[in-house]
């Protein structure tokens, strides 16, 4: 069963100054909106980080990544993210799409080195704040060096984890504050958000059972039941709180093929909208920088 958190329509809107001003006004009224590809400032308010994106509207013709598509798989350890990402990559490549599969932490030489540093299961304890900053550093390199260039080339980018994982694991799991960690991630990526975030929803007991068959686990996967329960709840809460965004909750139970078909139910309309926007030269708010978080008009 697929729960589509956000319903939206495809529209073609002229690239005019007025349309950009109206889009900006809608964004400014929505505190949960994250612009795509903007610079901003990271400040400290009441002992918390606060990110303020630049409010300058995008200029017509300044959307080099219009044709790209950025899809993220999220969920707890054992939810099936890596498996479903690989299945989707195979399916899309069979249809002729250029696809890059990547992961977090990782995706770049720096990111992979940081992944080894922060996830290695050893006796060295990593402070929660240091852990969050390591993930943010990996994500900054990932967005700048791999994801943005791929989107600019019209590539479909599939990522195993992204912003929501830090909000869930470090923000809630480590009790650092979801909003604080989200603002840190937004600053690190210059507000690069996915066109779609697919949360694979699997009961916590099933996740634990799947993990028991892996044999070896990393440092975070080895955390206790209370930590995992907080993270599991956090993912569901994040999807629910982003009801006006591009979050999709997909039932992760069942066979690999069954879950794959559910994932395709999410992805097919996105691909169709992407192709329509490209072929007709229209401004689909889902495929222009700064527009994916707002409802089509």
Question: What do these predicted ranges mean?
Answer:
Residues 41-64, 89, 205-297:
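NTP-dependent small-molecule kinase module
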Residues 66-70:
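Pre-Walker A (Motif I) flank of P-loop NTPase domains
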Residues 73:
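Hydrophobic anchor at the beta1->P-loop junction of P-loop NTPases
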Residues 78:
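Walker A (P-loop) phosphate-binding loop of P-loop NTPases
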Residues 81:
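Conserved lysine of the Walker
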Residues 84:
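Hydrophobic positions on the alpha1 helix immediately C-terminal to the Walker A/P-loop
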Residues 95-189, 262:
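ATP-dependent small-molecule kinase phosphotransfer cores
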Residues 161, 165-233:
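A glycine- and Lys/Arg-enriched "phosphate-lid" helix/loop adjacent to the NTP-binding pocket
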């Amino acid at each position: 069963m697929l729960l589509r958190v956000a319903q939206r329509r495809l529209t073609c809107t002229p690239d005019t100054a007025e349309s950009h001003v109206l889009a900006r006004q809608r964004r400014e009224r929505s505190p949960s909106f994250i612009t795509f590809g903007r610079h901003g400032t990271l400040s400290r308010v009441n002992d918390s980080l606060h990110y303020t994106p630049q409010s300058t509207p995008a200029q017509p013709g300044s959307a080099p990544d219009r044709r790209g598509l950025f899809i993220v798989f999220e969920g707890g350890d054992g939810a099936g993210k890596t498996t479903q990402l690989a299945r989707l990559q195979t399916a899309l490549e069979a249809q002729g799409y250029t696809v890059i599969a990547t992961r977090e932490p990782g995706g770049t030489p720096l990111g992979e080195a940081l992944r080894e540093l922060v996830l290695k299961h050893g006796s060295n304890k990593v402070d929660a704040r240091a852990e969050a900053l390591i993930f943010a550093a990996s994500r900054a390199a990932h967005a700048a060096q791999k994801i943005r260039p791929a989107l600019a080339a019209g590539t479909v980018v599939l990522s195993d984890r992204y912003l929501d994982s830090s909000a869930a694991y470090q923000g809630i799991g480590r009790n650092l504050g979801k909003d604080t960690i989200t603002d840190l991630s937004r600053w690190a990526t210059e507000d690069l958000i996915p066109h779609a975030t697919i949360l694979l929803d699997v009961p916590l007991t099933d996740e634990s059972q799947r993990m028991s068959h892996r044999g070896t686990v990393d440092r975070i996967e080895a955390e206790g039941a209370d930590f995992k329960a907080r993270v599991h709840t956090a993912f569901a809460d994040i999807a629910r709180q982003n009801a006006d965004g591009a979050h999709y909750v997909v039932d992760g139970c069942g066979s690999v093929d069954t879950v794959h078909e559910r994932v395709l139910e999410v992805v097919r309309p996105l691909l169709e909208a992407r192709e329509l926007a490209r072929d007709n030269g229209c401004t689909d708010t889902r495929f222009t920088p700064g527009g994916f978080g707002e409802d089509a008009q």
